[in-house]
Swiss-Prot record:
UniProt-reported outcome of changing L569E: Abolished interaction with DHX15
Residues of the G-patch domain: 551-596
Cell compartment(s), UniProt: Nucleus, Nucleolus
Known partners and oligomeric status: Interacts with NF-kappa-B. Interacts with XRN2. Interacts (via G-patch domain) with DHX15; promoting the RNA helicase activity of DHX15.
Function comment: Enhances the ATPase activity of DHX15 by acting like a brace that tethers mobile sections of DHX15 together, stabilizing a functional conformation with high RNA affinity of DHX15. Involved in the constitutive silencing of the interferon beta promoter, independently of the virus-induced signals, and in the inhibition of the basal and cytokine-induced iNOS promoter activity. Also involved in the regulation of IL-8 transcription.
One of the GO BP terms on file: negative regulation of DNA-templated transcription
Name listed for the protein in its UniProt record: NF-kappa-B-repressing factor
Signal peptide start-end: none
PANTHER family: NF-KAPPA-B-REPRESSING FACTOR (PTHR16148:SF15), NF-KAPPA-B-REPRESSING FACTOR-RELATED (PTHR16148)
Tissues where the protein occurs: Widely and constitutively expressed. Expressed at lower level in colon, peripheral blood lymphocytes, lung and kidney.
Gene that encodes it: NKRF
Region (Active repression domain): 1-296
GO cellular component: nucleolus; nucleoplasm; nucleus
Amino acid sequence: MEKILQMAEGIDIGEMPSYDLVLSKPSKGQKRHLSTCDGQNPPKKQAGSKFHARPRFEPVHFVASSSKDERQEDPYGPQTKEVNEQTHFASMPRDIYQDYTQDSFSIQDGNSQYCDSSGFILTKDQPVTANMYFDSGNPAPSTTSQQANSQSTPEPSPSQTFPESVVAEKQYFIEKLTATIWKNLSNPEMTSGSDKINYTYMLTRCIQACKTNPEYIYAPLKEIPPADIPKNKKLLTDGYACEVRCQNIYLTTGYAGSKNGSRDRATELAVKLLQKRIEVRVVRRKFKHTFGEDLVVCQIGMSSYEFPPALKPPEDLVVLGKDASGQPIFNASAKHWTNFVITENANDAIGILNNSASFNKMSIEYKYEMMPNRTWRCRVFLQDHCLAEGYGTKKTSKHAAADEALKILQKTQPTYPSVKSSQCHTGSSPRGSGKKKDIKDLVVYENSSNPVCTLNDTAQFNRMTVEYVYERMTGLRWKCKVILESEVIAEAVGVKKTVKYEAAGEAVKTLKKTQPTVINNLKKGAVEDVISRNEIQGRSAEEAYKQQIKEDNIGNQLLRKMGWTGGGLGKSGEGIREPISVKEQHKREGLGLDVERVNKIAKRDIEQIIRNYARSESHTDLTFSRELTNDERKQIHQIAQKYGLKSKSHGVGHDRYLVVGRKRRKEDLLDQLKQEGQVGHYELVMPQAN
């Protein structure tokens, strides 16, 4: 007891008028009452703290020892720990601090004997151990504090949206995902080969290993209120925010100038978060102007108030069960199976049912049963309602049951009106002008072997609009109509995935019978008259060779006196024939660093070629070689724009080349093609008379 009093001497805990455990400050003229554990000598008055203002109450953390050896292990005593705790409290948020103080008082309430003025916790039955901490971040708290916390800490109110069973199931999934992350990090294939880890690939691979898929939700920063954007991200005005979720559990949010950048940033933060000690919590998050409960992953011991606003509506987060694939069902019991809408965006019946169930937010399940004749029976359940069944092997029975279920659902579907496609290609002519263009003036522009691309390029070349209109037929068959300037050109019937291609092909064939066709042969075969790198560099060499040495040059006179009569240097004339050209060095680089720039093309040479073409009357486009780099093609684009020319790159990778040409009107190009038959890589094919 004497050791404890010596350690507690001079500790000031401040004023706490709102708690009964701490005595209020005595009025003037009255002596301060001593507690029962103060002894005979009153504590000495201690000078003010050198650090910062203390909070109104702070728990006292001390180290008690029963021997001199234990005292020698901590030579600085409790003063050092008191300073560390003051720094810890200063950096804690206010809400965490209030919870901290409430837990500390709960600990005091759970013990029968303590010193009310000094704040020490004293027990009779259990000895005081060394290094006792009340911080929740300590990995090994004392048994007494654990019991006190379990008795006095109020349990959080249960969530009405997410039951405890759902939270426990999500916690198990996150633990499984965390173990998968650590396993992949130890895999040399994931980290070797490049200095930077592909976090998006790693997270997707780990989540798919847990038999589910990640969910990415994007939102433009312009649609997010400035107050909801982090302070360090307010410089981004045209960027995107990406929220990463998995099984409806919020992981992280990333911000960047593009969608892919925000996704990569969010996945990087998610992988780093999953490497820590984490847990699944139910917190209230802001969505636009409302608040709702959400499942989040946060680090153990950290507060949950720093989460950014949600990008997914709260009504889409209600989880009440799982489907056959393990995916969550969103408010599934509220819908009846007769309201099921089929979205035929797959080739087989199983894919159509699964995609339609995800679209309708309903549950679909396949149940198998072994029959006495060693065959399997598969039954399809939609919203716990048995639709159909199939027999055969385990694989064929599922397909048979899905086919029967799809036929039953198609009979219950309402009669849908014609569904217009959203593809509409418009030229630069104003649509609101009210002038309807005649199909007789149309010119087919063929730039690709794909009929859909040809039809879209034709509409853009003639400044017309093209639409694709779908109509549901019987079964899985659809009818697609091609409408050009409100006039039906062609139609086709087939599967929805391929019917558009077939209808566009019929439309192109119909138009070619009556309309002229302009064929762009640029992408077909090798391109002639290509400007190579050596040809561009040759212009600089020609200018250098123009610097001929005159007869009165001192070097020339010395060579003449030594017997040089012209040509190459040396006894047999095997040396250089032309004098060394003077090369300008504009930057502050040394001569040794100029080796890498030998093959670079000068900008003035490119500009000279394009300037000569712009001033000429040539109608043939300039085609630059595939040898040019991206930076060199970028310079050509800039120079072509400067002289009012159009430029476009074609090809992919090493086969990419650039074409510079004049801006031509459709009428001018047709007139030239009618006169000459072929202009550059353009060719005119007139319709053949029947």
